[in-house]
């Protein structure tokens, strides 16, 4: 009697032909900028018992968990879709694992990778000082309820990057005296002479890089 065929079903995200772009970005951020230095990149390889091939990128996270993005080629040859690409995004913890959406994967990544505003930036913004940090992964905040501090720092960063408009100049004139007093009181702060904000491009997020739901 012929053995019954069994299927293993996992959720995947069908994408256009962007896995090479994804791999290039991962290698650039891992070896060039060191933003993803802790990530483990497993190149495109053949799975022995399957017809499809895959690659893996493993991102170690906090508390012993990790996020894994698997890229698949040739998932449905019986239909002639030999160029079909897809990814699976899985979060592994100590006690369980689950598949997650690209939006939640961005939140998990930002908890460990790519710097964000530090706690002292609100005080620096109020005193009119230069911000010493910035958020390199703004898309990770898109599907969260942002705090008022984060929204304010985003506005301040954007305004200063675009140059001082008339409204901003008027604000500076009206508050010059109070800012001068605040700066005098905080003259002993060693952080004022710190380094400028971390340079580098913002990470666009998994969905945008891979073209998920494009």
From Swiss-Prot:
It is a peripheral membrane protein. Homomultimer; in vitro and presumably in vivo. Interacts with viral Pr55Gag precursor and host APOBEC3G. The interaction between Vif and APOBEC3G is species-specific, which may play a role in restricting the replication of SIV to their host. Forms an E3 ligase complex by interacting with host CUL5 and elongin BC complex (ELOB and ELOC). The modification Phosphothreonine is found at residue 98. Vif-defective viruses show catastrophic failure in reverse transcription due to APOBEC-induced mutations that initiate a DNA base repair pathway and compromise the structural integrity of the ssDNA. In the absence of Vif, the virion is morphologically abnormal. It is found in: Host cytoplasm; Host cell membrane; Virion. A motif (HCCH motif) lies at residues 110-141. It comes from Simian immunodeficiency virus (isolate Mm142-83) (SIV-mac). GO terms for cellular component: host cell cytoplasm; host cell plasma membrane; membrane; virion component. Residues 154-166 are annotated as: Multimerization. Its main location: host cell. Residues 180-203 are annotated as: Disordered. Signal peptide: none annotated. Counteracts the innate antiviral activity of APOBEC3G. Forms a complex with host APOBEC3G thus preventing the entry of this lethally hypermutating enzyme into progeny virions. Functions as an adapter molecule, recruiting APOBEC3G to the ubiquitin-proteasome machinery. Targets APOBEC3G for degradation through the assembly with elongin BC complex, CUL5 and RBX1. Binds viral RNA and affects the stability of viral nucleoprotein core. May play a role in viral morphology. This is Virion infectivity factor. InterPro entries: Vif (IPR000475).
């Amino acid at each position: 009697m012929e053995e019954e065929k069994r299927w293993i079903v996992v959720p995947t995200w069908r994408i256009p032909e962007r896995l090479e772009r994804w791999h290039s970005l991962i290698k650039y951020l891992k070896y060039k900028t060191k933003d993803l230095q802790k990530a483990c990149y497993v190149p495109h390889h053949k799975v022995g018992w399957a017809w499809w091939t895959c690659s893996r990128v493993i991102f170690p996270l906090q508390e012993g968990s990790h996020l894994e993005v698997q890229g698949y080629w040739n998932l449905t040859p019986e239909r002639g879709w030999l160029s079909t690409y897809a990814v699976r995004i899985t979060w592994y913890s100590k006690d369980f694992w689950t598949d997650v959406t690209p939006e939640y994967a961005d939140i998990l990544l930002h908890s460990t990778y790519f710097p964000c505003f530090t706690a002292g930036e609100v005080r620096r913004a109020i005193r009119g000082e230069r911000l010493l940090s910035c958020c390199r992964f703004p898309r990770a905040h898109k599907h969260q309820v942002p705090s008022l501090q984060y929204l304010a720092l985003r506005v301040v960063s954007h305004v200063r990057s675009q140059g001082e408009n008339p409204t901003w100049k008027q604000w500076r004139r009206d508050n010059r005296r109070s800012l001068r007093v605040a700066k005098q009181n905080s003259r002993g702060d060693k952080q004022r002479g710190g380094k400028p904000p971390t340079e580098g491009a913002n990470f666009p997020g998994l969905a945008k890089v891979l073209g998920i739901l494009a």
